């Protein structure tokens, strides 16, 4: 077939060269954005008198037809037409005649593809924000059901201090809230229009870029045409934000995997989110959590891939930029899928409150309580720390826990110990007393939950 740009050329490319250079296999995902962008563009052309109203109306009718066909998956794309832009233009000309060739007046594929991706990411970022809020809603529900579920808090994967399971869950709520905030802030840079920047230098036609931007729902336009067509920082920012979100999901999945093991038994995954072994009939594997953990590396790879593509490109457009889309599409699909799976997995998991409770009665996670007890009686904390360290050593040598140590032994360590000491050794009491702002104390968790409910309600519609 003849190329829409073929006037300069006397030889046709080999079929395998065309296939190597074509992007239609993946950029057809931009079909809706491409057509909507074209409708806005031709509407502007008519307003400015660059095409007649009759020509614009005929072009818009053709584009609307193609849009409906696209929604029903009836469009047939060709490698020969290279990309989504030329495929749509070719179909339009076939549908309405040569007047369709006026659509591209005052426009380049360079600003056209950038516009498509801005429109695409604007929509997808909003979807991801909503899906993240839905996951946060699940976390709020689990936290509400586990305010007084006591578990070990860990540092270095060693039991450190008793905490509420709700407090642990809400830690991820706030991480996800920052992820949502980052996505929301990125919309300021996504929601601007490159349309009308042309190939790199603008156009001689009297276009109205602000009007096109308004028609497409953008908040403004790029101030520099070179910048508009050559940078992909808005995609990189999306990939970076998605990498951080996936990092948070991966960390949580790592804990879910540990907690579901026989060594912990803190939770049990629903059968819907686990698989078995082909050889070991007893196995129940947390495959979905493992896949989310693994797919995090995939999203990281997409970020570093595009960073590497961009690092050496001179202004303005270079064909290297064709490599900006597949990682973006893949990240959107991966993040949306992981958020959906994560929400279902957390909503259906069973919490073993008894096992969690046992874990904080058979350890030394209450040691800090004794140090605080002595400090509250006026002993410098460092001295209190030393005394409690010796008590823990004594217990490990005897094979007992701090609750088992007789008061007489405590008094040998310090005369400040009294019978009320044993009251502070209760894990429940230890959690309840940690009532500083943002702490694991039950009053603080209630306050955090109220604030969290308000935040998820902003998008999901709880209130």
UniProtKB/Swiss-Prot annotation:
Compartments (UniProt record):
Cytoplasm
Q: Which keywords accompany this UniProt record?
A: Amino-acid biosynthesis, Arginine biosynthesis, Cytoplasm, Lyase
The reaction(s) annotated as catalysed by this protein in its Swiss-Prot or TrEMBL entry are:
2-(N(omega)-L-arginino)succinate = fumarate + L-arginine
One GO CC term, this protein: cytosol
GO MF: argininosuccinate lyase activity
Q: What class of enzyme is it?
A: lyase
Give the pathway: Amino-acid biosynthesis; L-arginine biosynthesis; L-arginine from L-ornithine and carbamoyl phosphate: step 3/3
Q: Which domain of life is it from?
A: Bacteria
User: What's an example Gene Ontology biological process for this entry?
Assistant: L-arginine biosynthetic process
The EC number of this protein is 4.3.2.1
Q: Tell me which family the UniProt entry assigns to this protein.
A: Belongs to the lyase 1 family. Argininosuccinate lyase subfamily.
Q: Which HAMAP family match?
A: Arg_succ_lyase (MF_00006)
| Entry-linked PANTHER family | ARGININOSUCCINATE LYASE
Protein known as: Argininosuccinate lyase
Species this protein is from? Bacillus thuringiensis subsp. konkukian (strain 97-27)
């Amino acid at each position: 077939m003849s190329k829409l740009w073929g006037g300069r050329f006397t030889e046709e490319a080999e079929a395998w060269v065309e296939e190597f250079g074509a992007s239609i296999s993946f950029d057809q995902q931009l079909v809706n954005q491409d057509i909507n962008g074209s409708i806005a563009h031709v509407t502007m052309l008519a307003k400015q008198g660059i095409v007649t109203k009759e020509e614009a109306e005929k072009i818009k009718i053709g584009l609307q037809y193609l849009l409906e066909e696209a929604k029903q998956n009836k469009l047939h794309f060709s490698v020969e037409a290279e990309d989504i832009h030329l495929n749509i233009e070719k179909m339009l000309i076939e549908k309405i005649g040569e007047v369709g060739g006026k659509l591209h007046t005052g426009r380049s594929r360079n600003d056209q593809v950038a516009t498509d991706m801005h429109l695409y990411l604007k929509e997808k970022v909003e979807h991801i924000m909503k899906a993240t809020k839905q996951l946060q809603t699940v976390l709020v529900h689990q936290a509400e059901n586990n305010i007084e579920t006591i578990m070990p808090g860990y540092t270095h994967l060693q039991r450190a201090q008793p905490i509420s399971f709700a407090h642990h869950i809400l830690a991820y709520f706030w991480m996800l809230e920052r992820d949502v905030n980052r996505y929301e802030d990125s919309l300021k840079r996504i929601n601007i229009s490159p349309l009308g920047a042309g190939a790199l230098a603008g156009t001689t036609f009297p276009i109205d870029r602000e009007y096109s931007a308004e028609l497409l729902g953008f908040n403004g336009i790029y101030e520099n045409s070179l910048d508009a067509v050559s940078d992909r920082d808005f995609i990189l920012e999306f990939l970076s934000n998605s990498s951080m979100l996936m990092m948070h999901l991966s960390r949580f999945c790592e804990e879910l995997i540990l907690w579901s093991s026989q060594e912990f038994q803190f939770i049990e995954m629903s059968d819907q989110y686990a698989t078995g072994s082909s050889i070991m009939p007893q196995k129940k594997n947390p495959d979905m959590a493992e896949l989310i953990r693994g797919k995090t590396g995939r999203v990281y790879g997409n970020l570093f891939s595009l960073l590497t593509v961009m690092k050496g490109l001179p202004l303005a457009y270079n064909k290297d930029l064709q490599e900006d889309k597949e990682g973006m599409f893949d990240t959107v699909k991966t993040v949306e899928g992981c958020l959906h799976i994560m929400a279902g997995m957390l909503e259906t998991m069973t919490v073993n409150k008894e096992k969690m409770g046992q874990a904080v009665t058979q350890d030394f996670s209450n040691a800090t309580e004794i140090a605080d007890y002595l400090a509250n009686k006026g002993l410098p904390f460092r001295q209190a720390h030393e005394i409690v360290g010796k008590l823990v050593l004594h217990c490990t040598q005897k094979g007992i826990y701090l609750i088992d140590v007789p008061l007489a032994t405590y008094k040998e360590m310090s005369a400040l110990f009294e019978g009320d000491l044993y009251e502070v050794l209760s894990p429940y009491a230890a959690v309840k007393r940690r009532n500083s702002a943002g702490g694991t104390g039950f009053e603080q968790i209630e306050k955090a939950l109220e604030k969290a409910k308000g935040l998820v309600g902003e998008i999901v519609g709880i209130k």
